[in-house]
Design a protein with these regions (language model features):
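Active-site/pore-lining binding-face segments in mid-to-C-terminal subdomains
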Residues: 217-282
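Short, thiol/selenol-centered motifs that function as redox-active sites or metal-ligating centers
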Residues: 133-145, 151-155, 188-213
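Non-globular targeting/processing and membrane-anchoring segments
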Residues: 27-182, 261-409
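Bacterial N-terminal signal peptides that target proteins for export
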Residues: 1-9
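Hydrophobic, Leu/Ile/Phe/Ala-enriched alpha-helical segments that form helix-helix packing faces
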Residues: 114-119, 212-219
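Bacterial N-terminal signal peptides
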Residues: 10-18
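Thiol-based oxidoreductase modules, predominantly thioredoxin-like and allied folds used
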Residues: 150-199, 224-238, 242
Length: 409
């Protein structure tokens, strides 16, 4: 008996489908019967893959990078070989190395691990705003290494690269002054405003730049560029020379990740200062969604004379990470912010005893508060440090994003 060739082919296809599927007989029957006899199968057509992102071009300013190595006690033989092999510099190099290793083992590594579980997973911020920072990049990198842009503000001058780089005596004095100015700050966990102001107003150490370069280089980054700039009345950047600049920008990288930017401003953030000149606030308002870090801030935002910067932070920041010297607990509207406490809080140092917050002590007592495995801030002297993480509630964030979109449309 003969069969039409089409039926033979159909039967063969059904046979192959039947034995190639690892399903139950019922499923097999349903699968076969669900396919119309006239169904035609096509391979899914996939378009060409999207091209990979353009590779990052990592440039290095070899002189600036060598200078950063010199001030941080690292090999600097490209431009400073005449001093790098000098016995006095080699002693400084050993001291700086021992001090940095101590900081890494006793503080920085713990901070970085803490940040990986607390800060990095909890915020979409692309930038960090650090008022009252001075040159404190020591705490910025380990706590916010997931952020690529940093805006730091202090009262210390911007500073420049030392002019007389060919003079061994001047270089030694310059490097020694940097080491001494940072030694106590590194151990204490904060900059002493009055002493730092005096130390950074000298001929051989005239501002924050060398200290920032010290930290950037010690954290393993290479320096791409340094620019000085001014701001127009709307907060847009204008080119400037160091003498008249309002800020400086350092670009740096580690040859692996993104190119990072650090802006340092010398600016008065008091209400009087911002009333005279609000360009910095306008500049910050143009930033990507940002978080805020506050540490050893002299309790300035507890005063009515710093209400403007306090209000800006509370209105615009996605998160605030701070110790008790930042914004008072009572300023964070309940329900608008998620809160987590770390460490311990029962008192302030005697210099700021008038800034004790009974509401904060009650919050710590009621809990929950989690242990903090590193020392930071004013209370480091009696080993009672605290950190507070405030994250704007999702509903508040969504409302602000919608409002920003409406304003931009």
């Amino acid at each position: 008996m003969s069969f039409p060739i089409s039926k033979v082919i159909s039967a063969g296809l059904i046979f192959l489908v039947f034995f190639s599927c690892k399903t139950s007989p019922v499923q097999q029957e349903e699968t076969v019967s669900a396919v119309p006899k006239d169904t035609v199968y096509y391979d899914t057509v996939i378009g060409p893959p999207e091209p990979p992102p353009a590779p990052i071009v990592y440039s290095v300013d070899t002189f600036l990078n060598d200078y950063a190595s010199l001030v941080s006690g690292l090999p600097a033989d490209k431009y400073f070989g005449h001093f790098y092999l000098d016995s006095s510099y080699m002693r400084l190099e050993r001291r700086s190395g021992r001090e940095w290793n101590y900081m890494m083992e006793n503080k920085i590594n713990n901070m970085r691990a803490w940040s990986d579980t607390v800060v990095a997973p909890s915020s979409e911020a692309k930038a960090l705003f650090y008022p009252f920072a001075g040159a404190d990049f020591l705490h910025v990198d380990p706590l916010f290494h997931n952020v690529n842009r940093y805006v730091m503000v202090g009262l210390e001058p911007l500073g420049t690269v030392i002019a007389d780089t060919g003079n061994k005596r001047v270089l030694k004095s310059h490097a020694d002054k940097i080491y001494r100015s940072l030694y106590f700050s590194n151990r204490l966990g904060f900059f002493r405003t009055l002493s730092m102001r005096a130390e950074l107003n000298q001929k051989e150490l005239n501002g924050a730049l060398p200290l920032l370069l010290f930290y950037i280089r010690r954290f393993g980054y290479s320096i791409s560029s340094l620019e000085y700039f001014d701001l127009d009345s709307t907060g847009n950047v204008l080119q400037s020379d160091p003498a008249s600049a309002i800020g400086l920008k350092i670009k740096f990288h580690d040859f692996k990740g993104p190119i990072r930017e650090l802006d340092y401003f010398r600016f008065d953030l008091s209400d009087d200062g911002l009333q005279r000149d609000d360009r910095l606030i306008r500049y910050v308002s143009k930033m990507e969604p940002y978080g805020v870090y506050l540490k050893a801030a002299s309790y300035l935002m507890h005063n009515s004379s710093f209400s403007s910067i306090r209000g800006t932070i509370l209105n615009k920041a996605l998160f605030v990470l701070q110790d008790d010297s930042g914004i008072p607990l009572s300023s964070f509207e309940e329900g608008a912010w998620e809160r987590q406490l770390w460490g311990k809080y029962t008192r302030t140092i005697s210099l700021f005893r008038g800034r004790y917050q009974s509401s904060l002590a009650s919050a710590y007592k009621q809990g929950p508060s989690l242990p903090l495995n590193f020392y930071i801030g004013y209370n480091i002297s009696h080993k009672e440090c605290n950190m507070m993480w405030f994250r704007k509630s999702i509903s508040i964030n969504t409302t602000q994003s919608n409002n920003q979109g409406a304003n931009q449309s």
